[in-house]
A protein has these predicted regions:
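Serine-esterase "nucleophile elbow" of acetyl-processing enzymes
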Residues: 1-61, 71-80
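Structural recognition of the beta-strand scaffold that forms the well-ordered cores
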Residues: 16-18, 54-59, 83-87, 122-126, ...
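Surface-exposed cleft-lining segments at the edges of enzyme active sites
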Residues: 26, 58-64, 90-102, 132-137
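Non-membrane alpha-helical structural segments and their capping/turn regions in soluble enzymes
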Residues: 34, 66, 98-109, 139-147, ...
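Catalytic-core regions of hydrolytic enzymes
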Residues: 60-83, 97-107
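Active-site segments of SGNH/GDSL-like serine hydrolases
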Residues: 87-91, 112-143
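Charged, glycine-enriched surface loops/patches
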Residues: 101-125, 148, 152-158
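Catalytic His-Asp segment of secreted/periplasmic serine-dependent ester chemistry enzymes
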Residues: 128-215
Length: 215
């Protein structure tokens, strides 16, 4: 994570990309409120006065790791990013699709390599847990897919933001952070943003974008 933190010490503008599925896309389930990428943008470009930084979301609802690979050149490479935040897995762990666990892990490794080949830093993220007992096509497989994210990040010595573990550590709030079985609401996106701030050492309790009430 130190490689990412150093960007905040530089006067050079930084290009940040957030890549993933509907959870990062932030559509529908926030009901018009800011998603975690928009909150990150507020914190970085306004509150930290990094006005020349560019923050791009190229996440697409319904996507999976195979889709991220297939459209990588258009959605990531053309922008020549400095940092790529990757959050994926909720659709991969769906038993109704044809992405097996081994392919998921392989896709993660290939994504990490492709991001690294651009000279960018990949930041792996686990995603929000599924509400207990819901989404039976996903729930039994979710933990193993999150473990794959942790393993690839560890094997490649990549930064990891472990939202899944953080949410499990705050299990009493889990229900209040969700819009349905596996999509976070606006409060869930605030929880995402706050953990990112803390992991990057840019959390400030006096900041407007850091001090939102989260149930």
């Amino acid at each position: 994570m130190e490689r990412v933190k150093k960007f905040f010490e530089s006067d050079a503008p930084v290009k940040w990309i957030f890549y993933g599925d509907s959870i990062t896309h932030g559509a529908l389930h926030t009901f018009g409120q800011r998603d975690y990428v928009e909150l990150f943008s507020e914190r970085v470009r306004f509150e930290l006065a990094r006005t020349m930084d560019i923050i791009i979301t190229t996440a697409i609802s319904g996507d999976n790791s195979r889709g991220l690979l297939n459209s990588f050149d258009w959605r990531v490479a053309q922008f020549k990013p400095d940092v790529v935040f990757l959050m994926i897995g909720m659709n991969d762990c769906n038993a109704d699709n044809d992405i097996e666990f081994d392919e998921f892990e392989s896709n993660l490794s290939e994504l990490a390599a492709k991001i690294g080949d651009l000279g960018a830093v990949p930041v792996f993220q686990t995603t929000c847990p599924i509400l207990p007992g819901q989404a039976p096509e996903r729930f039994p497989h979710f933990d193993s897919y999150m473990d794959a994210i942790r393993k690839v990040a560890s094997d490649r010595k990549l930064p990891l933001i472990d939202h899944a573990q953080y949410w499990k550590d705050h299990a009493d709030s889990h229900f209040y952070w969700m819009n349905n079985a596996f999509h976070p609401n606006a409060d869930g996106h605030r929880a995402f943003a706050q953990l990112i701030y803390r992991c990057l050492d840019i959390y400030d309790e006096n900041s407007h974008s850091c001090r939102f009430h989260i149930p």
